[in-house]
Amino acid sequence: MGSPFILLNYKTYNQGTGQGAVEIARACRAVSEESGIEIAVAPQLPDIYRVASEVELPIFSQHMDGVGAGSFTGHVFGKCIKEAGAVGTLINHSERRLTLAEIEASLKAAKEFGLRAVICTNNVPTTAAAAALEPDYVAIEPPELIGSGIPVSKADPEVVSGSVEAVAKINSGVKVLCGAGISKGEDLRAALDLGSQGVLLASGIVKAADPKAALEDLIRLV
Ligand code: G3P
């Protein structure tokens, strides 16, 4: 398999807010350059432009809506996040769930604006359904393990391998990420050994005392 993809979601953690968003992005950029591994960040929406202006690395939005230009007050417009500097977006994160129709509309809008789309899911059947929509990635994250420090790749390996198998049957062009509790080198290694092509993670890096050191530990067994 090729080099993994690592996507770091800042959520609304204090450490990843404002100037902190830039500092963590700098750490990601440094580790990405040293290792050759693609590391992307998903800061809060108002920080996208700030991070993009100061650090050269792939930036994802934490959410976008399936709306076009016009009368959509309070919505996240794909053109706006793209112009702010994002190259992709999460869709349907378990902390920002959407209806099936909304997922489909967000994905359509992401494609229209040339944004890479990661549809988040919570089990094998929803992963299979998401893959049928043909996003760039699906990210399987059992909600009960999110933020727990217990890695999905060790606590529930079947949900990762089951997702990989289900996606391969539906559309082998869709890449599978996994997430929840991932923070250490052995967690990422186990995720890759189960067939995933990368990880979506948050607290283990964003809340670490030294995010750069935490990232270096994360990739040490790749
Ligand atoms: O989006 C990533 C996420 O939900 C996993 O969070 O803190 O368990 O790495 P965490």
Curated annotation (Swiss-Prot):
The first-level EC class reads isomerase
Q: How is this protein annotated for GO cellular component?
A: cytosol
Signal sequence coordinates: none
Q: Which InterPro entries would you find in this protein's record?
A: Aldolase_TIM, TIM_sf, Triosephosphate_isomerase, Triosephosphate_isomerase_arc
According to its UniProt record, where is this protein mainly located?
Answer: cytoplasm
Keyword annotations for this protein, in alphabetical order, are: Cytoplasm, Gluconeogenesis, Glycolysis, Isomerase
List the CDD domains. Answer: TIM
Pathway it works in: Carbohydrate biosynthesis; gluconeogenesis; Carbohydrate degradation; glycolysis; D-glyceraldehyde 3-phosphate from glycerone phosphate: step 1/1
List where in the cell it is found: Cytoplasm
**EC number(s) per UniProt?**
5.3.1.1
GO BP terms, alphabetized: gluconeogenesis; glyceraldehyde-3-phosphate biosynthetic process; glycerol catabolic process; glycolytic process
SUPFAM superfamilies recorded: Triosephosphate isomerase (TIM) (SSF51351)
List the catalytic activities from the record.
D-glyceraldehyde 3-phosphate = dihydroxyacetone phosphate
Q: Does the keyword Ligase apply?
A: no
Q: List the active-site residues.
A: H93 (electrophile), E141 (proton acceptor)
UniProt-recorded Gene Ontology molecular function terms: triose-phosphate isomerase activity
Q: Which residues bind substrate?
A: N9, Y10, K11, I146, G181, A202, S203
Return the Pfam families for the record.
Answer: TIM
Task performed by this protein: Involved in the gluconeogenesis. Catalyzes stereospecifically the conversion of dihydroxyacetone phosphate (DHAP) to D-glyceraldehyde-3-phosphate (G3P).
Family named by the database record: Belongs to the triosephosphate isomerase family.
Q: How does it assemble?
A: Homotetramer; dimer of dimers.
- Under what name is this protein listed? Triosephosphate isomerase
- Origin organism is Methanosarcina acetivorans (strain ATCC 35395 / DSM 2834 / JCM 12185 / C2A)
